[in-house]
């Protein structure tokens, strides 16, 4: 006769803890933010290389040659851990050579790197030329330093002091808070330039009325070239693929290609008055997006309210204003200002440039419409279905899964609508 065995105690059962629910806002794959050197995904290869470097540093020094090699490996290891050190050394070297030379005029070869060139006499007007590329290149290095320094020295400790323990969240907060810092400066800077011009408030007729704009005011040129440096630096990080691509990697890459084409063509062919309003629409909306994401990562109760404001601003700036500019290409491009092709006088506002301008701005609008679709999907999930499943990138999912394998999960589920 078979005996019935008692069931094991519930204390011995392995209860699979329910993962903590996440909000969609912080991980929705949209926007212009590109991962940095300091937040890139650590692959097995990079971890193995780091172990090799540490082994070399632990080896005994037998002669001067070994000592030099150890110093070099020490510098490389520090630079890998703190990516802002190498660009800082370049900046210090150039600035030191420039200011200690006793010649801070345009005759100094370093002047074209540290300051804007082509000032017209003693006026506030600045022309354009090949030296502007030197300025853009140098400030690409500056933005590399600025981003890595702020994220490593300022934002990371700040996030830890706010009791953020997840390595993944700290990295995402670092990226978004730097975006808040940059767009929080560039957005008002661009609005200031627009306010002190005839472009206020997104006056489309003024974009064409004075064409060709061979010169720009000092602050206008600093803003324009600074933006070019910022976007070029981001594009380099994106091209190098230092981060595992997110789901909208192709759209993000396409967005950067179109943006850089717009920057280059508008500057070279004297359409800078068209570029300024587009810069502003991107910066202000990006500021609100990053602010909403940061509040979401910090589990703030204001995250949904902030996200709602962002959605309204995104639709107004990236769609209404940009479509208004796109419509002006069809209606005002021909009628306002000169409309003639003349290579001798650099007159390029003509029947050839019209479709090119329209296609580039239209391509930018298509990417923004795709991201708007993702935004509406998030709103639908939150408001109607209550589903908080993420549209996150592979890198984010993998990183969180790696983290969860080494850290205990919270067995008590928490509901977060935003």
Swiss-Prot record:
Binding, fumonisin B1: 169, 172, 182, 231, 255, 286, 289, 293, 296-297, 303-304, 307, 314, 371, 375, 378, 382, 385
Q: Cytoplasmic side of the membrane: what ranges?
A: 2-81, 156-172, 241-249, 296-305, 383-418
What is one process in the GO biological process aspect for this record? ceramide biosynthetic process
Any single Gene Ontology cellular-component annotation: acyl-CoA ceramide synthase complex
- Phenotype of the disrupted gene, per the record: Does not affect the level of total sphingolipids. Exhibits weak diffusion barriers only in cortical ER and not in the nuclear envelope. Double knockout of LAC1 and LAG1 abolishes growth and leads to mating defects including defects in diploid cell formation, pheromone-induced shmoo formation, induction of cell cycle arrest and activation of mating-specific MAP kinase. Also defective in the localization of STE5 to the plasma membrane.
TLC domain: residues covered: 168-385
Positions of the region Disordered?
1-25, 390-418
State which pathway it belongs to.
Answer: Lipid metabolism; sphingolipid metabolism
Protein name as it appears in the record: Ceramide synthase LAC1
Name of the gene: LAC1
């Amino acid at each position: 006769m078979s005996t019935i065995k008692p069931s094991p105690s519930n204390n011995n059962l392995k209860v699979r803890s329910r993962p903590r629910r996440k909000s969609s806002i912080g991980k929705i794959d949209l926007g212009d933010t590109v991962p940095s050197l300091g937040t890139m995904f650590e692959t097995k290869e990079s971890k193995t290389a780091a172990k090799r470097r540490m082994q070399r540093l632990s080896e005994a020094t037998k002669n001067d040659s070994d000592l030099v090699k150890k110093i070099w490996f020490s510098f490389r290891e520090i630079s890998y851990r703190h990516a802002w050190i190498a660009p800082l050394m370049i900046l210090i070297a150039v600035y030191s050579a420039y200011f200690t030379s006793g010649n801070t005029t345009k005759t100094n070869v370093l002047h074209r790197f540290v300051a804007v060139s082509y000032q017209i006499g003693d006026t506030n007007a600045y022309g354009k030329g090949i030296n502007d590329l030197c300025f853009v290149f140098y400030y690409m290095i500056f933005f590399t330093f600025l981003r890595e320094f702020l994220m490593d020295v300022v934002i990371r400790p700040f996030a830890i002091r706010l009791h953020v323990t997840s390595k993944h969240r700290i990295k995402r907060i670092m990226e978004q808070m730097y975006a808040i810092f940059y767009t929080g400066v560039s957005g008002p800077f661009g609005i200031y330039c627009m306010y002190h011009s005839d472009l206020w408030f997104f006056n489309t007729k003024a974009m064409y009325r004075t064409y060709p704009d061979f010169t720009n005011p000092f602050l206008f040129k600093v803003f324009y070239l600074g933006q070019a440096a910022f976007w070029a630096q981001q594009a380099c990080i994106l091209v190098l693929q230092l981060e595992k691509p997110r789901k909208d990697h192709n759209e993000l890459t396409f967005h950067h290609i179109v943006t850089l084409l717009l920057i280059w063509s508008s500057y070279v062919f004297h359409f800078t008055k068209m570029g300024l309003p587009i810069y502003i629409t991107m910066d202000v909306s990006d500021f609100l997006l990053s602010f909403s994401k940061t509040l979401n990562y910090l589990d703030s109760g204001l995250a949904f309210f902030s996200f709602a404001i962002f959605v309204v601003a995104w639709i107004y700036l990236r769609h209404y204003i940009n479509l208004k500019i796109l419509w002006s290409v069809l209606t005002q491009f021909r009628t306002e200002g000169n409309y003639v092709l003349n290579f001798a006088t650099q007159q390029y506002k003509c029947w050839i440039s019209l479709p090119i301008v329209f296609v580039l701005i239209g391509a930018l609008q298509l990417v923004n419409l795709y991201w708007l679709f993702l935004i509406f999907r998030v709103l639908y999930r939150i408001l109607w279905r209550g589903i908080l499943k993420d549209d996150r990138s592979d890198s984010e999912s993998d990183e969180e899964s790696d983290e969860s394998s080494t850290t205990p999960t919270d067995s008590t589920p928490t509901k977060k609508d935003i």
